[in-house]
A protein has these predicted regions:
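Short, surface-exposed beta-strand/beta-hairpin micro-motifs centered on an aromatic residue
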Residues: 90-93, 204-210
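Beta-strand-rich domain onsets/edges
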Residues: 22-40, 116-175, 181-185, 235-256
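Mid-chain, structured segments of secreted extracytoplasmic proteins
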Residues: 64-113
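Sec/Tat signal peptide C-region and signal peptidase I cleavage site
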Residues: 16-21
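Short flexible loop/turn segments that cap and initiate beta-strands
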Residues: 53-62, 170-177
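Short acidic/polar inter-strand loop motif in beta-rich domains
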Residues: 48-50, 108-115, 225-232
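Short, acidic Ser/Thr/Gly-rich low-complexity loop/linker segments typical of extracellular
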Residues: 186-204
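Bacterial N-terminal signal peptides that target proteins for export
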Residues: 1-9
Length: 256
């Protein structure tokens, strides 16, 4: 009797436990380079608020940068790094001209058997070279993408970040946006409800979120692809498309 009860309780717990939010990280060494120079970018597929686990990430389908000079393919600059035995990637890129640099990645589809779907998170982040405050709203032209309405560089902690969720260049009404902080180990969530913040875009696809703590914040607008893909078992399964953008919040320091 006790054994059957224990098994039943475990089944209920597993059924009601919230699914961990996957986030494609694309994190630069700095969001603003006051004197320009080299930026290092780390690409990891993980659960940022919970500091893992790290998922296997194959070499991306696309990786590049958009500047005022146009679009540049950086796929050849990626170097594989292993974390907990899983593939992650790192690239270095020199910014010699002033203005915004919009880095982006299209990962290869990730099969998530626990959710019965593929995941493709189109991710971008902006680095401001020479602190010009320009070029931050350049669009990459990804299948799903966040159009920032707030400059995503030089942002103070507590500032409101606003954006528009786009699919095929058109706003997505009432899109669901998941938000997570890149945990540096200093915060433990009271329970699972605090791990991933969830907000809804309005009828025009616009969302807003005030970042309460310094560090990197990931915004993941999730929509379902129009077409399905074949699972490893040969079944037609849905594809989750994520429009991700990373924004860094910085505390106001005292004047020295």
């Amino acid at each position: 009797m006790f054994k059957r009860l224990a098994v039943s309780c475990l089944a209920v717990t597993m059924a009601t436990a919230p699914a961990l939010a996957h986030f494609q990280e694309l994190l630069p060494s700095a969001d603003v380079l006051a004197q320009g120079g080299e930026v290092s970018l780390d690409l990891v597929f993980t659960h940022p608020m919970e500091q893992g686990p790290v998922m296997q990430m194959e070499k991306p389908a696309r990786f590049g940068v958009v500047t005022k000079a146009g679009k540049t393919d950086l796929l050849g600059r990626l170097e594989e790094r292993k974390i907990d035995g899983k593939s992650t990637w790192r690239a270095k890129h020199a910014l010699q001209e002033p203005g915004g640099a919009v880095y982006y990645v299209e990962p290869k589809p990730y099969w998530e058997p626990a959710e019965g779907k593929f995941i493709i998170h189109y991710t971008k982040v902006v680095v401001d070279s020479f602190a010009t405050g320009e070029g931050w709203d350049e669009m990459v032209g990804l299948p799903v993408e966040i159009r920032p309405l707030t400059r995503p560089t030089g942002v103070w902690t507590g500032n409101l970040f606003r954006g528009v969720v786009l699919k095929d260049g058109k706003p997505v009404p009432f899109a669901e946006v998941e938000v997570e902080w890149k945990n540096d180990g200093s915060v433990k969530a009271p329970n699972d409800a605090f791990v991933t913040q969830v907000i809804k875009a309005d009828a025009s696809g616009t969302f807003a979120y005030a970042m309460p703590r310094a560090g990197w914040w990931g915004f993941a607008a999730l929509v379902e692809a129009d077409d399905k893909r074949k699972s490893p078992e040969g079944k037609d399964v849905p594809v989750e498309l994520g429009a991700l953008m990373w924004v860094k919040a910085t505390d106001m320091g005292a004047r020295k």
